[in-house]
Amino acid sequence: MTNFEEMQILESMEILVDTREQSTPKAIQRYNSFGVPYSKTTLAYGDYTANFVLLDGSRLYDISKTVNPLCIVERKMNLDELAQCFTHSRERFEREFQRAIAHNAFIHLICEDGSFEKIEGHKYNSKYPPKAFLASITAWQRRYNIHFHFCSSLETGHLIKEFLYRDMKERIEGGEFDG
């Protein structure tokens, strides 16, 4: 594939937002910060993925059906929500990542306004002990090959786009879409 063809695919990027993501004013602000078009569709797992127009004119995903993405971003608004997922919603959360792994998906998990320092200092509103919280993060990183990222909520939209763009660029350069 030529550099021109690679750029043609990458410039067609559209972020797909799972229909379960609420369209709050803050969410709309995040979507607008992608810097590329976005649309809502049903994702089998994850909150965000990206669609691209391939060289033959087809789209990577048919959004009229449930999408099983190659790369996803799961977003948590803070450590409280992440702690909830590891405790009260653990089975549902685990099933989602099992579905992703069954489709060989690459998984990014963004936790806004969190940090390992905040976890270790128990600076979140949950009785979930810091040691157990850290153990869950490290175990799930290994078990589901999840890449955890902590960031400011102001960075989230840009990071979602960047993670998905770079994943596709690596796939193209690795020959995944060569005819």
Tell me the role of every PLM-derived stretch.
Residues M1-N68, D80-G179:
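Non-catalytic C-terminal interaction segments of nucleic acid-processing enzymes
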Residues C71-M77:
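Conserved catalytic cores of phosphodiester-cleaving nucleases, focusing on short active-site segments
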